[in-house]
Amino acid sequence: MYRALWLSPLRFIVSSSSSKLTPYVSRGRGLSGIDNGAGCSCSRSVTTMIGNEFIRCQDESKILQLQIVDALRSGERQGASALLFKLIQGNYSLSADDFHDILYYCARSPDPVFVMETYSVMCKKEISLDSRSLLFIVKSLCNGGHLDKASEFIHAVREDDRISPLLPIYNFFLGACARTRSVYHASKCLELMDQRRVGKNGITYVALLKLAVFQRNLSTVNDIWKHYVNHYNLDILSLRRFIWSFTRLGDLKSAYELLQHMVYLALRGEFFVKSNRGKLHSTRLYIPVPSKDETGSEKFAFGVTDRIVDCNSSSKVALPKGHNKILAIRVLRWSFNDVIHACGQSKNSELAEQLMLQLKVMQQQNLKPYDSTLATVAAYCSKALQVDLAEHLLDQISECSYSYPFNNLLAAYDSLDQPERAVRVLARMKELKLRPDMRTYELLFSLFGNVNAPYEEGNMLSQVDCCKRINAIEMDMMRNGFQHSPISRLNVLRALGAEGMVNEMIRHLQKAENLSAHSNMYLGTPTYNIVLHSLLEANETDMVINIFKRMKSCGCPADVATYNIMIDCCSLIHSYKSACALVSMMIRDGFSPKAVTFTALMKILLNDANFEEALNLLDQAALEEIHLDVLSYNTILRKAFEKGMIDVIEYIVEQMHREKVNPDPTTCHYVFSCYVEKGYHATAIEALNVLSLRMLNEEDKESLQDKKIELEENFVMSEDPEAETKIIELFRKSEEHLAAALLNLRWCAMLGGRIIWSEDQSPWARALSNKYG
């Protein structure tokens, strides 16, 4: 018995425009004629199978049905058609029951072609369809992808027929619409269900939820949830479906609330049975009766479960044979997996902490999630740099056969430069007897290869320690049967170069080159770039040139980074001609000069005090629409400061302002110091004031006037001895430019300068604009 529980249209799932289209249904002589595609438009009546006794098929018709099914299974379609013709030519009366086996097979196969052939034969013999026949036909057409034809069958049954299709037919059709994401057909079916007052049950809502998730329509899911709790008992299976929907649509708060309620039901010991086809069903007797005293949403909000019956009560139904009893813990784990996966993807750290508390509650009740779930979520947390949460999750794992979650955590520690915490990860892997893979060793070389860098330069002690670490990792790697990969080799070379171990780095490079020669492969360009850069940092210009020649001779192509390194090398040997030749090679290889290229060329010219050509390069970059950064301008400012060339300083400052390049503290230092050394102290203070304001981003500049009084009282003009400490705190909040600007303004005030909060108030800024603008 199905009650019409929700008669208001559910057409919020689709646009209202889709309801204007209807599939074509032809009407014949009978009560419900359907165009079967073969010119068969016949009369028939649909009879119910509920409350009626079935007449047994004659033995001969039963045998013919089985023979037809066997022929279809073996692919003998012509033989099956011949047997079907023989079936209808018998001297006995036939009913829809004599075709059930055939139609059932066509529904399971699916075989929509033969099901229509069978239906055509039934039309010719004027055999009335019953509800089972109609269900099998609709299933066959839906499973075969013919939703249009299945929709015609459902719509063709008129109100004056002896019965309408039962709710399972509508539910199956809606499920097929959800699987194929056919919103139009689902809309037409829902309209028909409302017109015929068929009602809905839990299976209907499952299909509607899938359609709503497909459309990314969270409001629809909320509406379905409200209607569901008003008319149905909440059990673990229904909660799982809604949790799945909310997590897919990103409503983690609602999903978490339902998960808590689900844990409550699981702790009460609700059981399920699993059918032979893998379907889960509750063991409780289920009769949907709407509550009259309060809405289901209100009951859920207060945590009242007045209609939930204990598993040990008399309402439990007997379990049929052939079913396996399954604890609700499995369903709970699935839902917990959904929520925690979504939490990891959304990087919601607050909810993640709540989930960890929920996890502890579940563990106390032996409801621990799957190890695979914990591992996957730990990997997500590591990518989001939530290393504390990731490490906590990995500590909960009792068994793991793959190393990727641990590798992700090692990579996070590498990004955060926290190698000391990586030691605990390795210890945990050893506890789990988890064998490292190549990615693990690549990360170990990156984490533990260098000792002092980037904080200090390498010394003899750190270099010895670096060699010991690298050798230990290599020995363990070989014990586990791994050879160096391109990434691990690159990390080793980078570590040796950072420690200044040039000879050891060259030895590793030669070893890698020999191995590559035996395998008829060349080392990758990034590997050579690491070596070239490290040699350049060590001022080993001759070795840089030799490595570059070896690289070209072995056929390894150079990239933009390679050419820029070599142009930088030319600045050390003071050869502008060689740098120009490299630029020519770079262009021939298809690479366009970038900002770093122009900076390197200007550095060579400035080393020879050729400011005019350096400024010409600056203008050329502007003509070619190459946006130079603050490092490029600081390169010129540094040389101008060393030479005491105020005119060049002022020109570069105005050029930066015109190109909208914000200065940094280094820029302020060069400009301020140059004016001070020339004795222009008042101008130096004013310039420092203006450049400090220009360091701020647009958002800070817009709010500067509103916060001017507060900043003056608390930071700039404050006599509090802790004022500078408070300013430094801004660095920890990643507001380094604001902190540097406030420190500069405070020093300007201490030097007796008048603080201005707008560039327009500065005579110095206006003078530069008039002179060079």
UniProtKB/Swiss-Prot annotation:
Keywords: Repeat. Pfam families: PPR_2, PPR_3. This is Pentatricopeptide repeat-containing protein At1g76280. Belongs to the PPR family. P subfamily. PPR repeats lie at residues 130-165, 166-200, 201-231, 235-269, 332-369, 370-400, 402-436, 524-558, 559-593, 594-628, 629-663.
